[in-house]
Amino acid sequence: MLKYAWQSGPKQRNRWLWHLSNQIWKRSYSSKIRNIGILAHIDAGKTTTTERMLFYAGKTRALGEVHRGNTVTDYLTQERERGITICSSAVTFPWNDHRINLLDTPGHIDFTMEVEQSLYAVDGVVVVLDGTAGVEAQTVTVWSQADKHKLPRLIFVNKMDRPDADFEKCVSDLKDKLETQPVCLQYPVKNDDGVLAINDVITLERLSWQKKDLGRSYRNVKLEPSDDLRVLQEKRNELIDQLSGLDDELADVVISTESFDNVDNALIERALRRATAQQKVVPVLLGSAYKNVGIQRLMDAVNAYLPAPEERNQIYDCFGGEIKRGMRLISARGQAEVVSKLYEPLADEYREVGAVQSGDVVICAGLKSTVTGDLLTSTEEDDELDESAELFAIDPQIPDAVYFCSIEPPSVSSQTAMEQALKQLQREDPSLRVSYDSVTGQTVLGGMGELHMDIIKSRILSDYKIDVDLGPLQIAYKETIEAPALTTQSVEKEIAGSKQSVSITLEVVKNQAELFSLDKSPENLPNLNTLRPRILQVLRKGSISALERGPRVGGQVVETQIRLHNATIGRGTADSFVMATAAQCVQKLLSTSGTRLLEPIMALQIVAPSERISGIIADLSRRRALINDVLPKGERNKMILVNAPLAELSGYSSALRTISSGTGSMTMQPCGFSSMNSVDESLAERRAQGLE
């Protein structure tokens, strides 16, 4: 069976990335495959690290640099112009008799869905930390995503050549902020010439990279007796002691040996591999991707410590098989697909192949209707399809939109082309919401942030040649009921000679657990027992659809449950009529109950020199912000942790640069919704109506 995992970039229409792992089809080479993702906070050096891997593996002839716009994995025009990763990209390269399939993912919060999709396709991840910043906001987010997928991981502490880098602080952050068990395999040291070198804990060697050949070669020299060696031996003993408490094979050797010095390096590495695969520890390595230090040893660690596809103790182990050009596949939804071509990916370049075995990452051309989360198999048996879908289908967690705006084509003749472009972009990016507003007659986009919406507009122009117009960005408020309400809706009509009649009694109540329930009180239960399951489903669907648009600003109604008391459906009444009556009843209830607005709240991390902090805090106070903490950040800077309403943060990046004279930086991400006072609610309503 073959499981869809992630879709490639915008230029590969109908080309899809697959993760094929092996239990049924055992292949001898599958133990030499590593499917990995690379994750990080924005600007931690993730793409630079990937480019160095490609260079040292012989896949590229020159070093790709983000600031020069010549990277392999950041190939979109928008990525090269902005110097950020927007779409996940796949690259494949050999390293020391292994094959590494790597997915380079975005670090910006607006594109977190790209990370979520990519993690379905990998067996382990490398998390890159900025050695000068430690664990940052998006680091915590991607770490949580990896936790959800139970992925083994390595840490690469980057930028350790910089004078303000702090390795010990990074390790402390891993323990405190990520609540993990880091095991340091390397420690930073400066050579006599002041250049970054690495002391290896397991081998007790010093590793020094050569500038003259762009870091292609490095020297590993056994440390002579010295303070450095003594400290490193203590670190090695601590590593053995920690691993022996987690691995029985190593523990048996430790018990029988006279000294930790006698423990073989290969035995330590095998124990570390097992502990990493079981997610008991996280190996920590270091280097400087930009200065070409430490990358080869990072790739060695990927081969040594991250699992092969067949070693994952996950549902992926049950997927296996072979995919060939021209193969016919069936989705769990019963749709047939034909694989017209197969490609081995290198970002936006491809090498066509005839077939691939389980464990490989490939791009498929020709799939017309496959979307994120689909399961494809070669079987056409309904029972097997149903069982496969139940056991293995992916259910991506799509984040709520925080902004929305209208989108208009340049002319009526471009409307269909725009709709097709949006449909394709949604297949690639499920966090993009597209809806039709029946009141205004406009197509409405929902997205994760200002940058997200800007990129969508840019891609429609560059990839589909449609110069669309976006309306002003609006905040994606939500609504919740003020008080419970109960009403009965009775409707009778004759449509095309057929009598349609529905009478239903519904109630809305405060509830966060489920959207729709039955009132099984003694007086209502006999009536509810007469309703067929299909009618109950129709009533549920119609009722819930009305919660998508609240009465005040058209926001989604949340923290609300619809309770069905009774229903009487006339013979021959169409399902669509029943559904519409249920929706009208809920809309009537929402108007009767009244709703309160909930506004999106953002969590910010702001770093600035200490002398600028008071001015920044004063400005935040005017923005209805809640200051959670102010922490030291290095010798001269401080970090402000703050929650603030999204509505107050329009243009805040520019404001921060002005207040801090260009010395401040910030990151922000959604952290939930909060109720509003009546004054702010009135202002939000006026903004939604275009009066502000």
Curated annotation (Swiss-Prot):
Tell me one GO biological process term.
mitochondrial translation
InterPro entries the UniProt entry points to: EFG2, EFG_II, EFG_III, EFG_III/V, EFG_V, EFG_V-like, G_TR_CS, P-loop_NTPase
* UniProt-listed Pfam families: EFG_C, EFG_III, GTP_EFTU
Entry GO CC: mitochondrion
Q: What is its main location?
A: mitochondrion
Q: Which UniProt keywords apply?
A: GTP-binding, Mitochondrion, Nucleotide-binding, Protein biosynthesis, Transit peptide
UniProt GO molecular function = GTP binding; GTPase activity
Cell compartment(s), UniProt: Mitochondrion
Reading the lineage from the top rank, the first entry is Eukaryota
- Point out the transit peptide region: 1-29
Q: Where is the tr-type G domain?
A: 31-310
Query: Which residues are GTP-binding?
Result: 40-47, 104-108, 158-161
Q: What does this protein do?
A: Mitochondrial GTPase that mediates the disassembly of ribosomes from messenger RNA at the termination of mitochondrial protein biosynthesis. Not involved in the GTP-dependent ribosomal translocation step during translation elongation.
Family from the record: Belongs to the TRAFAC class translation factor GTPase superfamily. Classic translation factor GTPase family. EF-G/EF-2 subfamily.
* Protein name in the entry: Ribosome-releasing factor 2, mitochondrial
Q: Which organism is it from?
A: Drosophila sechellia
Q: What is the lineage of its organism?
A: Eukaryota, Metazoa, Ecdysozoa, Arthropoda, Hexapoda
